[in-house]
Amino acid sequence: MELFKGQSLLEFTERFKTDLDCEEYLASIKWEDGYCCRKCGHKKYQVRKDFSRTCNICGDTESPTTGTLFHRLKFGLRKAFYICFEMSTTTKSLSASQVARRYEISRQTAHYFMQKVREAMKSSESHKMDDLGFQSLI
């Protein structure tokens, strides 16, 4: 499955230089149709520096990664984006050991995250992809 159709590694690296770039992208997709507080349902909010949204009424803060496969990562969001990119554009199968070495994370963490990505890819096969493909993974 080609999640990044027409997307070269160079274009990808230019787009996602920092974890904040990744958070900004996730926020733009997550709240594309507007924000609604998950606790009280209010629609007015403040945007924080990390692109999180804080409800004006109850003060609940929601991160762009909450409720996505990137929630509670034990490594940087940029690394996670790169792993997703590699998994979706590589023709050969990647092992957790390879990913662990390449991205300097533990084998167990690599295995767990790769499982989450594979599940998201399976469940999104019938959904339309956006230009980078993450929308269907979120």
Give the residues covered by each predicted segment.
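Residue-level recognition of single "structural anchor" positions
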Residues: 1-138
